[in-house]
């Protein structure tokens, strides 16, 4: 057996590579997108609700 099969070589290479996440996660690690996600969603919903409510009597409608 002069040469190892290709799958065995690939498995050895994959096993020897470092992990993508080399630093352990802590409780303070929060992705930037989810940090302000709830605030942005609430602000958008509040704006849409206000537009819907005030457009009925046309006193403060910004659309059309």
UniProtKB/Swiss-Prot annotation:
Q: Where in the cell is it found?
A: Secreted
Its tissue distribution reads: Expressed by the venom duct.
Q: Which GO terms describe its cellular component?
A: extracellular region
Q: Which UniProt keywords apply?
A: Amidation, Disulfide bond, Neurotoxin, Secreted, Signal, Toxin
* Endpoints of the signal sequence: 1-22
* Segments traversing the membrane: none
Q: Which residues form the propeptide?
A: 23-51
- Is Secreted there in the keyword field? yes
- InterPro entries linked to this entry: T-conotoxin
What modifications does the entry list under PTM / processing?
Contains 2 disulfide bonds that can be either 'C1-C3, C2-C4' or 'C1-C4, C2-C3', since these disulfide connectivities have been observed for conotoxins with cysteine framework V (for examples, see AC P0DQQ7 and AC P81755).
Q: Which residues carry this modification: Isoleucine amide?
A: 63
GO molecular function terms here? Answer: toxin activity
Domain notes from UniProt: The cysteine framework is V (CC-CC).
Listed name of the protein: Conotoxin Ts-011
In which organism is this protein found? Answer: Conus tessulatus (Tessellate cone)
């Amino acid at each position: 057996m002069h040469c190892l099969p290709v799958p065995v070589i690939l498995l050895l290479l994959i096993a020897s590579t470092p992990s993508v996440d080399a630093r352990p996660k802590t409780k303070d690690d929060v992705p930037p997108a989810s940090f302000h996600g709830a605030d942005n969603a609430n602000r958008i919903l509040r704006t849409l609700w206000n537009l819907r409510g005030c457009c009925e009597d046309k006193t403060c409608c910004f659309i059309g």
